[in-house]
Amino acid sequence: GLSDFGLSERANIPRAEAQAFINTYFATYSGISYYMLAIKEQARTQGFVTTLLGRKRQIPELAARNPTLRAAGERMAINMPIQGTAADIVKIAMIRLDERLLAGGFRARPLLQVHDELLLEVPRDEVDRLVPILRETMESALPLDVPLTVDIKVGDDWDTMTPLTRADAIAA
């Protein structure tokens, strides 16, 4: 939903170049334009949108007379099913991970969830055993037609996190 102006400012390119990029993007991925039009129409008709799991969000802004407010409602209608489904998925993963931590006798514990990211405190001697469980739990939280992949990092603090590849996990 970024405008040519917004893209030109962020990428430090001329607006015409930004618009050409946007046009090429939507021509290449035409399903995105279809989705955006369809979800806005559905939201206008029903007054709400839903996540894949059926959680609803009412969008009264779509009926606003103010065009700026109405445009904000359209952005909500486009983004909520995607972002809301991601939130649903991470919450499912959190519940299942907690169950697996308890069942496995782990001392590890979840500390924080930010968007689609989980931060855990894990004793060093549990890292190798927990990584495959964490990966499988998060990647299988909701079966979809596209694979969910997880990036796992380890470290003593956020500043020193090191990515852990699948090969690292297999070798452990």
Residue ranges and their predicted role:
Residues 1-172:
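Conserved catalytic core of nucleotide polymerization and phosphodiester-bond processing enzymes
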